[in-house]
Design a protein with these regions (language model features):
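Conserved, structured core segments of small domains
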Residues: 1-111
Length: 111
């Protein structure tokens, strides 16, 4: 088992009808994942407060697609890939990115 995170980036606004269908589709996806024996830890991100590009200029908000949600879970690599591929988000203008993650190393004790 490894730690994984799904990152969701919104690229467009969805209609009220799409929102209803998306809720049903995501509920079905959650059930599929639970049936695989995987527990999900979902998080929603609010609007960007500040984004500082590499060149150092500060901007309010973010002009590109917005990182809107992320879901953390533990699974095998094959399960993680299947979980990402099954997610309905792309049908609603949301990209899905799968990454493995590790916890930061503990700080060295101070002398």
């Amino acid at each position: 088992m490894h730690h994984y995170v799904l990152l969701f980036r919104t690229t467009r606004t969805i209609t009220a009808e799409e929102q209803k269908q998306r809720i049903a589709d995501i509920s079905a996806w959650i059930k599929q994942v639970a049936d695989m024996g995987v527990s999900l830890d979902p998080h929603t991100l609010e609007e960007t407060v500040l984004a500082i590009p590499a060149e150092g200029a500060q901007t309010s908000g973010h002009p590109d697609s917005t990182l809107s949600n992320f879901v953390m879970f533990d699974a095998t690599r094959d399960q993680a890939i299947q979980i990402a591929r099954l997610h309905p988000a792309p049908r609603y203008g949301v990209s899905v990115e799968l990454r493995e993650w590790t916890a930061p190393r503990p700080l060295a004790p101070r002398p």
